[in-house]
Amino acid sequence: PVNVPEYEMCIAWDSINGGLAGISTTDRKLAVSWQLDMRPTMQPVIFPESGELVINNFENGEDELIVVDIATGELLSRAKVNARLANGMFLTPGFNRDIFYCTTGTFSKVTWY
């Protein structure tokens, strides 16, 4: 999981069974705020200033990046990265709402607006 104190939210995911969730930490209590039917296999990147989380979603032998609103769980954007393997090497933030994706055989730069 990753804690996002600016939003009183903890983000959790299940790489084996699938699932992505935002868990509220308001008032030092844990409560599920939102859930998405996704299958992340990599660590997310958090953009606290825009309230966005970027993580991969590996399904049906294809990987994509998704952008999620941290507070609401709304899926804001998604982009295929033309990867057949998501072994979780890394996601790295760029400089302006962009991210670098690297896995075996694939390197991509993804920008969203």
Regions found by a protein language model. Name each.
Residues 58, 62-106:
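C-terminal closing repeat unit and adjoining cap/tail of repeat-based domains
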Residues 12, 22-23, 46, 67-68:
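Hydrophobic beta-strand positions
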Residues 6, 16, 26, 49, ...:
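Short, ordered coil/turn segments that flank beta-strands lining enzyme active or ligand-binding pockets
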Residues 1-6, 37-49, 83-96:
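Repeated scaffold domains used in trafficking and secretory/extracellular systems
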Residues 29-36, 74-80:
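A short beta-strand motif characteristic of beta-propeller blades
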Residues 6-14, 51-58, 97-103:
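Short beta-strand elements that form the blades of beta-propeller/WD-repeat-like
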Residues 17-22, 61-66, 106-113:
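Structural motif
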Residues 24-28, 69-72, 113:
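Short loop/turn segments that connect beta-strands within beta-propeller blades
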